[in-house]
Amino acid sequence: MHTKVYNLSLVTGAFALAAAFALSASAEGMKGPKTPYDLAKERLGSADPSHQKVYGGKDAPPGAFPFQVSLLQAEAKKGDEFNYHFCGGSLIADTWVLTAGHCVTSEGEILDPTRINVYVGSTDFKNGDRIAVKSVYRHPQYNADFTDNDVALLKLERAPKKEVKVGKINLIDATKDSTLETPGTDLTIVGWGTTEQGSLSRTLRYTSVKIVDRTECNNNILQNRATSLDDSLSGIVRSFRIPDDKVSAIRQSILDNAGQIVNENMICAGDPKPDPAAQFVHDTCQGDSGGPLVAKSSDKATQVGIVSWGEGCGVPKLHGVYTRLGKFMDWVKSTATN
């Protein structure tokens, strides 16, 4: 009878590397993670409205954010548009909408434009203008596993009707992108959805957030993900009889190998110093994806980011992550050409 002998360093090293990838990636199978469009399909008919939230937000007055748009599933019946909302976006030209790459993705593929409508000119899904989409452009380096290069453009079939009040948002000058490295900078997030109490709201909501140091943000997210691996670690310890003094070293190795999941293409924003007694902090959630992260100066709104991803919603120290628009302005300008 032969006794199987395991090389402890190889076992722990291989597990650490595999677990590190699991920490940094977000894939759910070969077709990638479920996207807002997929989740909205599943949600229809459900009594749970918690798919979309701006935590700690206020109702936006009519006309306050005239550039904000809603992405709808095209099969929505007239008058029922809100229930088919799955992402946000921003009007950047008469016939161009900026949104997130994951908003135009379903089962790993780019959505056909016939499956999307855009609703403009309303904060409450009343008396707005519903427009068909002609073309969908997702960034060529979009990475679903890491939600990287998370940006897309929609070419509309026509401009909004003249009687509908809309406005185009200014986009960040790429040469001024370095200002977004300063923690504490005030920004605004906008989106539709339920309040933090879970009551459904058809009114556009907004709240303020601050830029958070990217390294701090990254570390908080990794530590949160690492806790979910504790059960797996326990199983490995039992199977391979790893000494207790090695377990903490394995855990640290996992974190070290996971790298920067919040990279230079992203902005982290939230409540840097939340009230210790707070049950939630100002944040966006899934249904707000694709909407704008806005800087305001002298009553001028400038879009600096796009709602992209996060760990949960409104969780203290787990801040929202946004596409850093300044890194993609060359692509935006070259794509939205007419």
PLM regions and their residue ranges:
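Extracellular/periplasmic catalytic domains that process cell-envelope and extracellular macromolecules
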Residues: 59-64, 91-92, 110-112, 124-130, ...
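Conserved catalytic-core segment of clan PA serine endopeptidases
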Residues: 55, 116-162, 172-176, 183, ...
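Extracellular trypsin-like serine protease catalytic domains
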Residues: 70-74, 205-338
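Active-site-proximal beta-strands of protease catalytic cores
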Residues: 96-101, 180-195, 294-312
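Conserved H-D interstitial segment of serine endopeptidase catalytic domains
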Residues: 39, 71-74, 97-100, 104-144, ...
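Protease-domain processing segments flanking chymotrypsin-fold serine proteases, especially trypsin-like
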Residues: 2-98, 106-111, 116-117, 229-261, ...
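Residues that flank catalytic or metal-binding motifs in active/ligand-binding sites
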Residues: 65-67, 87, 114, 132, ...
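Structural signal for hydrophobic/aromatic residues that build the beta-strand cores
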Residues: 69, 89, 95-97, 118, ...
